[in-house]
């Protein structure tokens, strides 16, 4: 319960930053297009800094075991998410964007600052498993959903700055290559901005949406229910039955971090790729915005249930 309360407090802080981002646009100091500048900073500077800094730790058997578990969990969880997405697409006649939003979560932008605040920066390394698997699927499975078959670009996958930063971090971790203290501290300082910047971007995007249209859209609430409540409950049952949280070592915390990544709102990447590939970007933004606002209630509840059951 303590973790759930800490989570609720941190998500509330991030939600207030979302409202600040909305206020900047509503007051006409900025417009929603300016969010692209912050998105570029987050994608190409802040996120890589977080991942490289996360791997600047001692190479120990416990950490290796935790990393292996985080990658394995990421693969298993994504298999389940994709399977559930297909099932719900059929049952609820979801369109492409609704389908994508049920499968892909905002794990990087939201989970990293939450893990840093609740568990400490030394635990951020265990978010890398979920992020690297998800990033690979963004440019393969998600791209296929939005564009159709025959549109994979492996060069794009392998040269993605976030994938490269994880590879660099893993390489330095494996060979225990330590950055100079001043550089590592600089990366840590930049990385600390990931939550506020991501939430400002979210607020700026939400401010440009037609709120009346969103509030009256039953489909958006259906997607929010699937993404934030039903799918997390199904995954929670899987964690409970499998007993993976009780493997020993750091498994309990690693599994909790991985589960946290699956209960977060719809991925901002779905919105960004919808813009690029000619899908309904306004609808994608609406789903992203509503699930981001509602997660302040649903995420602490899911973590409280997790701690009570597991």
Give a label for each model feature:
Residues 1-310:
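Alpha-helical transmembrane segments of multi-pass small-molecule/ion transporters
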């Amino acid at each position: 319960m303590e973790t759930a309360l800490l989570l609720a407090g941190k998500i509330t802080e991030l939600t207030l930053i979302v409202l600040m981002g909305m206020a900047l646009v509503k007051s006409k100091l900025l417009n929603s297009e300016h969010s692209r500048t912050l998105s570029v900073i987050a994608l190409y500077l802040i996120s890589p800094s977080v991942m490289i800094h996360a791997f600047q730790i001692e190479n120990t058997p416990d950490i290796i075991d935790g990393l292996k578990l985080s990658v394995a969990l990421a693969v298993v969880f994504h298999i389940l998410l994709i399977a559930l997405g297909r099932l719900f697409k059929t049952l609820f006649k979801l369109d492409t964007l609704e389908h994508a939003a049920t499968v892909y979560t905002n794990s990087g932008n939201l989970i990293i600052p939450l893990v840093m605040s609740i568990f400490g920066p030394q635990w951020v390394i265990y978010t890398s498993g979920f992020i690297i698997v998800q990033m690979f699927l963004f440019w393969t499975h998600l791209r296929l959903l939005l564009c159709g078959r025959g549109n994979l670009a492996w060069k794009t996958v392998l040269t993605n700055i976030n994938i490269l930063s994880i590879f660099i971090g893993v390489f330095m971790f494996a060979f225990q290559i330590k950055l100079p203290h001043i550089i590592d501290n600089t990366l840590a300082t930049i990385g600390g901005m990931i939550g506020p910047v991501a939430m400002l971007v979210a607020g700026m995007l939400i401010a440009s949406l037609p709120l009346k249209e969103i509030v009256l859209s039953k489909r958006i609430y259906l997607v929010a229910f699937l993404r934030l409540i039903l799918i997390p409950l199904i995954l929670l049952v899987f964690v409970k039955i499998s007993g993976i949280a009780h493997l020993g070592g750091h498994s309990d915390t690693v599994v909790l971090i991985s589960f946290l990544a699956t209960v977060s709102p719809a991925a901002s990447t779905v919105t960004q790729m919808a813009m690029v590939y000619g899908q309904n970007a306004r609808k994608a933004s609406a789903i992203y915005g509503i699930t981001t606002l509602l997660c302040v209630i649903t995420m602490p509840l899911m973590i409280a249930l997790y701690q009570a059951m597991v």
